[in-house]
């Protein structure tokens, strides 16, 4: 993902308008770079008075820098004052506090400390993102405009400002840490005092207050400090004791700060009727009428008590009643304030109403879903003030963020708020309601005038497009029913239906189908978010080249947020960076993908004649990633008890700001994202260990750690078998207490070095082992070009839309067997089927390969063989048993199976095997088994097809003509497939499975063309690492549920294929028939596009795909489809 997109995700709503306009300035740089040299130089020079030209890039940078500095200075002062208030606030009297159950005060203070900690993290995030944005913009100017802004602007100006270093934020954090320690000490003291047995004064005083015996309360007030008097007054308000109130107010006097503090405390502890507060106001008015001659001073006192006096959080009495939802008190207080002569009309959106957390009484009522309290506040507000700019987050947008509060939405709109008002990111309330899956809010907004065609800033998406991209079926139905247009396109030219289909939400296609003819010209890929980052692609290409000399280790991290350091300790272990070689000479930055130590590694590594690498002392085996923890990124873990000091020295780990893994397009509620994938190489995987550290923010202090052996993350079951189930999460232990503080899911894929070189069917292509230096500067372009040219005839579609370049591939040979076919079919995945498909003009034939219990690759589609009369997985049957399940095994195959069986040593003299001549024909049980189980049609079935014996991969390679290419599908179940088909969750070890099949192909394959494919993403990765033949990733494109995110949708499949530089994808044809323009998106990524599925047997569907550029179709009726395409070409030529 690009930095500008990550920055949009990291925006903190409160500060949204104060961020650097990164995208705007970057576009300006591109425009200036396209100008003639004279005009460009003019815009980059200062005027005679020292100012920058109006509208120039430098002027924009200066203005944005000033915005950032102003906000930082304002906020840091506010937060420092907040800390000071909390530290100087007097503690209440212990006994009276206990009498009022004022453990609430301690809890409230603890909440304030947490909120302050959170605000400091937000400010830290704001500073880091803007600093990074300035650095990238300066580097961009230097790159495209030939300036030196990285030095003159960034280093000499930005880096010297307070916001760009951590000193002031650290000072606040250290003060907060000290305050938190004192709070903990006071809590311990309170607990000890609560152990005392007798509190006669407390019990008597409470009884006297409840009975409103003022004389006894007067005695307790003699010589009492203000804090005690405030507590007694608060207790009197709660009890509704008028006489006690008079006496205590007489002692306190008409001091607004004490009276407001007592009233706030009483309101916060109210648990029943609010008559006591009304009695307090009545008593106060009576006293004021005696003390003051006119009503001016009494009104002013009430105004100060209710509105002006604030606590340490900057909240007044009005904030308290709105937060707790006391609607009656809200009405009463608003009535009192409005009745004061010469008072200004109430406007809850004015900055003066904001507390330290930028909350107003209005926003507090919204967050608490207090409809009646909100109604009271809005009734007292001047109707004209609703047009006033409400701040960074409009109330309607805020409502849709915090909950599905349709009644709150109704109150706000009826009070005059604009339903189409936008926030700083140009999102309306309707966009926000869709993003957070608030169907009731969506209904109410549409009912009260929200515009369903409003567009956001980032992608120019309407609410319908956003709902489609997140798969929210209910909201899509609501929007379509309200008249939202399904024909509109976003900034890249894609419709809502295409956004839904590419993300795997095919069930929405019927609701979003457009009747408008869309252009078949290439469109922008931006809003589809299917591109892999260049750094990901580079790191994986380098891993492919290093595979010959080292094992590649892919570590995946999930379910852990914050600043994470992942290290691999082992023999010559190195993190494979995706850093561009062009940056090798440039200065390192805080987000470079490789530190300088990696450069020295490249320089010091030498390549021996056998392709091995000499280890260097500067090798880097760790990487730091910033995993987003909320709507703002890189906030890191700032734990008060583990606060890092500002002068800690950073280590030499590579720092990787992991924008590439963060999904920018909105995720559905409870949706999943791909894990964070890191690539390492090492020589010895058996002795390697993985260390995962949770680091403090802005330092390398370790807050938690987990360590494990690399091999322990592979669920090895012995005998080359492994489990499909994920391992249990690893506990992350605190560095101080050694107690678990979090859990992390870690998954590992290891591509082990094999004795033989990587398999290639092309003699002209060789790949010697490369050093890391060579890998960093030499790409696999030549190798890829050779691969693509080798298969060009099968994967190139002509510009005219003709099908003469479209490969027709026989599905499982001549085609998948169908029960409804009227003509007799050859059995699928049989030798006869493969040979016949070649005779009928198939460019390639597709076959499915699995392995038996005795490790022989065989050709069979289903994971379960039930021709035996029982369900048996292929890997649980020996070759003899597998071939015996065939309806008509050939004599040659019988002999092969017998030879294998006879070579096997019996486990005991009493054991024996069934001779070949008397082996059991399992086919006799098939008919009985079919009656007992649900009707699942099996290919190559007796009575439905020209039944042929099962076959091995070796026989296919020997018998099928060399002129016919083979599309070999490696059948390996994913966990979701195993659960669907009720398989045991075990399978062969990844490496053993792939190596065994590749060795057979290498030994017997000859010089034919090969394409490898698999539905399992990890198998595809190993094929790309272990073989130079083209690899295709098979995806169901959303037509079936898959737990692996990479296999769940067309979008994820395209990103995955791009990352690992596969030849292309083989997609289920349904999504591409629904949205054929997505074929062009696949081609724009440089990937080949193959399709499979029953719908490919319809000629019209195939022609539709051919028109948009599909490279190959896998079909069941090879002859009919080939003839139809030839006729299609002839009709085009005649036209």
Curated annotation (Swiss-Prot):
Record-listed E.C. numbers: 3.1.4.2
Signal peptide (UniProt feature, chain positions): none
SMART domains: ANK
One function term, GO molecular function aspect: glycerophosphocholine phosphodiesterase activity
Domain SPX stretches: 60-155
GO CC, any one term: cytosol
ANK repeat extents: 357-386, 391-421, 425-454, 459-488, 492-521
Catalysis: reaction(s): sn-glycerol 3-phosphocholine + H2O = sn-glycerol 3-phosphate + choline + H(+)
Domain GP-PDE: residue ranges: 806-1125
Known cofactor(s): a divalent metal cation
Pfam families: Ank_5, C2_GDE1, GDPD
Residue ranges with Polar residues bias: 592-621, 792-803
UniProt keywords, alphabetically: ANK repeat, Cytoplasm, Hydrolase, Phosphoprotein, Repeat
Binding annotation for a divalent metal cation: 846, 848, 861
Residues with Phosphoserine modification: 580, 582, 910-912
Biological processes per GO annotation: glycerophospholipid catabolic process; lipid metabolic process
Chain segments carrying region Disordered: 583-621, 786-821, 888-915
Compartment list: Cytoplasm
Described purpose of this protein according to its UniProt entry: Glycerophosphocholine glycerophosphodiesterase responsible for the hydrolysis of intracellular glycerophosphocholine into glycerol-phosphate and choline. The choline is used for phosphatidyl-choline synthesis. Required for utilization of glycerophosphocholine as phosphate source.
Entry similarity comment: Belongs to the GDE1 family.
Protein's name in the database: Glycerophosphocholine phosphodiesterase gde1
Protein's organism: Schizosaccharomyces pombe (strain 972 / ATCC 24843) (Fission yeast)
Organism taxonomic ancestry: Eukaryota, Fungi, Dikarya, Ascomycota, Taphrinomycotina
